């Protein structure tokens, strides 16, 4: 972490102060650690990333736990994670079934997270500074859904559209909503969180709506015919 530099943004605006009041329980810490791919990766989460200080929401680990709390407990009936339910219910299950190796790194500023899988590849998801300090809690939770979709063998298949904030013409978009790619999963999660998220605040739900609409406008080669 000594080679990483970052500035902690407003923790009320990001939702970290709100969610941080819940995660500082050994039961939650143990559950997140054993469920979402941290096990065996202490070396990636110590040395300033927060392993020694898991309740400090200035640090990456606690900020990750905040997003996992949202991912896990935002459905009113969160114990029901059946795939026949809305994505707000089953996103937690989808993430834990597809991500079993979660690592923290500084990154080079070009991505908030990356997934790696395939033959002769150490299957893993890496999280970078941009996720913890450039995203609010709802985007972080949805980033897990996005990367889990990649780990479920669904790559991006198109270029970003004209005017996209992600760089018009660059690779990394989904062709359309029906492709059911990572952007569709991420946007759908944010949509449901906005519509029915529980154990949260109205500000966090509005943030999810804002980001979901941003992805609809910018992350699909053919814009989906929806607005949140």
Residue ranges and their predicted role:
Residues 1-141, 151-228:
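Predominantly extracellular/secreted Zn2+-dependent metalloproteases
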């Amino acid at each position: 972490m000594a080679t990483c530099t970052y500035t902690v943004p407003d923790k009320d605006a990001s939702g970290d102060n709100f969610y941080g009041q819940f995660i500082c329980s050994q039961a939650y810490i143990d559950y997140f650690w054993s469920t979402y791919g941290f096990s065996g990766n202490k070396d990636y989460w110590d040395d300033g990333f927060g392993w020694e200080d898991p309740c400090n929401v200035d640090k990456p680990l606690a900020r990750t736990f905040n997003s996992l709390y949202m991912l896990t407990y935002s459905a009113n009936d969160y114990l029901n994670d059946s795939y026949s339910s809305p994505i707000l219910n089953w996103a937690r299950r989808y993430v834990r079934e597809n991500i079993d190796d979660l690592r923290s790194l500084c990154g080079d500023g070009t991505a908030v997270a990356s997934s790696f899988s395939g033959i002769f590849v150490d299957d893993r998801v890496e999280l970078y500074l941009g996720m913890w300090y450039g995203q609010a809690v709802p985007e972080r939770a949805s980033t897990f859904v996005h990367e889990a979709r990649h780990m479920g063998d669904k790559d991006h298949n198109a270029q970003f559209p004209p005017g996209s904030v992600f760089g018009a013409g660059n690779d990394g978009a989904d062709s359309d909503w029906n492709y059911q790619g990572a952007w569709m999963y991420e946007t759908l999660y944010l949509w449901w969180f906005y519509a029915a998220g529980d154990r949260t605040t109205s500000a966090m739900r509005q943030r999810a709506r804002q980001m979901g609409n941003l992805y609809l406008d910018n992350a699909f080669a053919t814009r989906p015919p929806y607005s949140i």
